[in-house]
Amino acid sequence: MKKIAIAAAALFAFSGTAHAQMVRAQDPSSVARALQGAGYKAEMTKDDTGDPLIRSTSSGSNFAIFFFGCTKNVDCRTIQFFAGYDRDKSPSLSQMNDWNSKKRFGRAYLSDKGAARIEMDVDLDDGGISTKLFEDNLEFWVLLMAQFEKHIDS
């Protein structure tokens, strides 16, 4: 009986630790901590509707992490990495279509004013994702941004 109690206590302790290491949209600070843990700045703020928003930078390029599926500005379900580029010369619609037809991730489009935009959604609902998986998505996002910048500048 004593062994069962010890095993149960260990299981609960492990599950609490594992849960604490999850990156969850319901806990925007967990997203900020994961971003900082990967070596990026994380400026916590709010968007125009009051939902959480994190601003960051990679290699001199600004990006944001928007939170979606929020209930009254809390309990969010998903995040979206976003970067916008206002260049002297707007990329063509053909360039955007070329990107979207060749890239599985990183949806690209032009704003109403002709500025290039790229987004990547990450589902953090139902318990979130591990810090390691978040870092993997972050690395992929940073790579996509660099590739996209080359694409729109070509």
Segments and roles (model prediction):
Residues 16-20:
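Sec/Tat signal peptide C-region and signal peptidase I cleavage site
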Residues 7-8, 46-48, 58, 67-69, ...:
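A mature extracytoplasmic/lumenal domain signature
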Residues 21-73:
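N-terminal secretory signal peptides
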